[in-house]
Amino acid sequence: MSGIQFGLMIRGQFPQGEDMGARFEEMVEQVRLADQLGFTSLTKGLHYSSHPLQTLNQLVFLSRMAAETRKLRLNFGIILLSLHQPLEIAEQLASLDVISKGRVIFGAGLGYREVELAAFGVQRKQVVRRFTENIEAIKRLWTEDKVSMKGSYFELLDANVSVKPVQKPHPPIWIGANADPAIERAARIGDCWYVNPHNRMDTIERQVEVYKRALDAAGKPFPVEFPGRRECFVAATREEAIRLCRPYLTKKYEVYHAWGQDKAMPEGDNDLGLAFDDLIKDRFFLGSVDEVAEQIINYTRKTGINHHVLSCQWPGMPQSMALDTLQLLGKEVFPRVRQGV
């Protein structure tokens, strides 16, 4: 296992009517603080047509953040790859890898929302084929001088990226996956499976075994870097943490439920419409410094995840609460975790 790493997930999702210019400045403050506190990576998610929330574009945001830090890796977590053409994505990420001096992580997933598929003219039955062909094409574009490849929905004729990425052979490819077949696909075509934030620990433990079997079948070793994302909030006590974050986490998961995220999750652990006290059971990192440290240690031991991407702010949450959690994580939780694992 690689040494333990911690990433900051900036969803950057805010209620309609909020001043996004002001919210952007707050996100910059969080990123600068994360860099100072020893976080390893910065993740920005991606959704189009994100009503009832508003958010900044992933590529634009991460490109801007490349100038705010010299250390944080820049994780596209995730690109809805089935909606796009491979040459476009290959060029965008290679360019940012050059600008950031080799800090890009290519996170990719299928997507699940009908509004996004329809807007990009993609039929649901096409999603998996588009995804796998795009991954293959992007790898080739990053590693070959000229690429000729006829996909089902694109054609490359002696095509090349205008600039190659700094990282060799290419930036790491993290494949986001919820269902077992998608995890098996991640083992075949990605550098690692990027574990979702929604499922209970027992589900993730079971799916890690699915992933290991798929790696064995593909003749691949378990990855040195194994990332997973989790919701996280730290306060003086668990009761206080739950009281403070309840309204904001509740709102976020109501939106997930309305968007249909449940449909992408495995049977038996696919109801994000649960009452809050049931939703948080064995699912999020919430509590005091000692409790959250122990939760992360336990999760690491049971799953093997060693790059924990933590989301610490949800729609409507004041900036001060997010900054307080980041401070507690960096100064108190992370040292305890590194000592305890």
Question: Where do the language-model regions lie?
Answer:
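An alpha-helical appendage that flanks or caps ligand/catalytic pockets
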Residues: 2, 36, 125-161, 200-306, ...
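N-terminal beta1-alpha1-beta2 module of alpha/beta enzyme domains
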Residues: 1-69, 73, 168-171
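Alpha-helix-loop-beta-strand connector modules within alpha/beta enzyme cores
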Residues: 55-76, 130-134, 326-341
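Active-site mouth loops of central-metabolism enzymes
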Residues: 10-25, 79-87, 167-178, 233-235, ...
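Hydrophobic faces of well-ordered beta-strands that scaffold small-molecule active sites
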Residues: 6-10, 42-44, 74-76, 104-108, ...
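Conserved, mostly hydrophobic/aromatic
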Residues: 34, 38, 65, 96, ...
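Flexible, glycine-rich active-site loops centered on histidine and acidic residues
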Residues: 2-22, 82-149, 153, 193, ...
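Glycine-rich, proline-tolerant flexible connector loops at the mouths of alpha/beta enzymes
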Residues: 41-65, 80, 197-201, 311-322
